[in-house]
Amino acid sequence: MTPWYLYLIRTADNALYTGITTDVARRYRQHQTGKGAKALRGKGELTLAFAAQVGDRSLALRIEYRIKQLTKRQKERLVTEREAFEALLSSLQTPVLKND
């Protein structure tokens, strides 16, 4: 199973873009050369603010969705406090019990 990563890229105007990939370095290069997400094109200098392995694609999609719902302040906290990210990741890894 190929591991998936979540990453946050900071734009020149200090915005944070959230994405997932199996290869952070490759995806970051794509964004820098204008071959990544349209949302980052023309945004000036890009810096990789955060990256972490999150598991399989399903979990990566769930955490990406959850992070995209956060406020800018909450996203900044994930970048600066690893424990905040680990807590969020852990909350999404908890199995959901289904009633039969």
From Swiss-Prot:
CDD domains, per the entry: GIY-YIG_UPF0213
Short name of one Pfam family: GIY-YIG
PROSITE patterns documented for this protein: GIY_YIG (PS50164)
Lineage: superkingdom: Bacteria
Limits of the GIY-YIG domain: 2-77
Chain segments annotated as coiled-coil in the UniProt record: none
Family: Belongs to the UPF0213 family.
Family annotation (HAMAP family): UPF0213
PANTHER family given in the database record: UPF0213 PROTEIN YHBQ
Protein's UniProt name: UPF0213 protein YhbQ
Organism: Salmonella typhimurium (strain LT2 / SGSC1412 / ATCC 700720)
